[in-house]
């Protein structure tokens, strides 16, 4: 045991993170280097008696498709490598780099119309592989929707507009510019108007684009951290020898209640609507009523149970949202914050 703890390589450097190649007859895996924490990628053909050989770094983007998604006829696959999108031909195994940016493109997928889609931050794009045109589908803004030019509300403000012609003129000019901008966006279809506002101090917990690229399901949560300022632990082993206060997870007793709000966005109509949890069975059930009643009885008190909406959110899993093939229906995995109920909803 002492030898293993002192030198983990002595115990062995077993293959890690293996996955099948596109031909279903090749296996890729990673292996730790001797004496350091770096991992190398290896490939082994099952048709050959030759030992596995290392994949060169210059070719990692070609074989980094373990999480690739195929198109409807399964002739091509799409995946991301180091923030860029690649499309590979399933027959010739030739790959094409679609994006070459410093941004991080993720959630790459094929759409039912033959285009591809991907996400950069909270912005979703559609990319036509034939013409090269990129279309912004949705821009999720964690801010309040701009109110535009407002009329004076207070008595003092109204008097200012009456008595000072310059202020009234500025107000009129601002309204004219705002109206012209609105007319331009409405009448000129080359201008993108895909911003959707979800209020400040919020964050996108999960967002899923439909295979047709015409719908978006978004889960919004508060941006407030689950940790408090006091959730720290001293770290005595640091680079400079100075004791550091490391942020750690919240104490169990201080764990705040957590919930998410679901929104459905019709990208064709440009409409956003909140989804209600009230159709879920037991969404307002007092699931801990027996425990609370027992605790109250211990203190000589009587507990009166009452129905109250529970804190519900998407399950913390890889794919809590699943669309059908044409994007006309969607299924969700939901759970309550109290860990007493889960729902599979459509």
Residue ranges of model-derived segments:
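Beta-propeller folds
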Residues: 1-346
């Amino acid at each position: 045991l002492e030898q293993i703890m002192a030198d983990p390589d002595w115990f062995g450097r077993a293959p890690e993170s293996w996955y099948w190649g596109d031909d279903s007859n090749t296996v890729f895996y990673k292996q730790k280097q001797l004496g350091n924490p770096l991992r190398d990628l290896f490939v082994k053909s099952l048709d050959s008696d030759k030992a596995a050989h290392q994949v060169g770094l210059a070719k990692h983007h070609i074989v980094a498709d373990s999480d690739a998604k195929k198109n409807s006829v399964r002739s091509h696959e799409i995946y991301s490598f180091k923030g860029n999108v690649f499309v590979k031909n399933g027959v010739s195994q030739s790959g094409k780099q679609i994006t070459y940016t410093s941004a991080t493109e993720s959630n790459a997928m094929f759409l039912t119309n033959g285009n591809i889609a991907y996400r950069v931050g909270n912005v979703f794009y559609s990319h036509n592989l034939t013409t090269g045109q990129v279309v912004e589908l949705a821009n999720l803004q964690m801010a309040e929707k701009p109110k535009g030019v407002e009329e004076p509300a207070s008595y003092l403000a109204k008097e200012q507009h009456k008595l000072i012609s310059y202020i009234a003129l500025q107000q009129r000019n601002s309204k004219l510019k705002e109206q012209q901008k609105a007319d331009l966006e409405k009448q000129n279809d080359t201008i993108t108007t895909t911003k959707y506002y979800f209020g400040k101090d919020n964050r996108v917990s999960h967002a899923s684009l439909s295979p047709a690229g015409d719908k978006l399901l978004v889960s919004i949560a508060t941006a407030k951290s689950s940790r408090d300022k006091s959730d720290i632990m001293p770290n005595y082993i640091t680079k400079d020898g100075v004791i550091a206060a490391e942020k750690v997870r919240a104490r169990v007793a201080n764990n705040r209640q957590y919930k998410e709000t679901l929104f459905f966005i019709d990208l064709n109509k440009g409409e956003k609507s909140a989804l209600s949890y009230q159709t879920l069975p037991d969404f307002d059930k007092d699931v801990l009523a027996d425990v609370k009643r027992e605790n109250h009885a211990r203190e000589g008190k009587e507990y009166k149970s009452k129905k109250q909406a529970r804190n519900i959110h998407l399950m913390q899993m890889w794919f809590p949202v699943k669309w059908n093939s044409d994007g006309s229906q969607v299924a969700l995995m939901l759970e309550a914050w109290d860990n007493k109920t889960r729902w599979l909803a459509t």
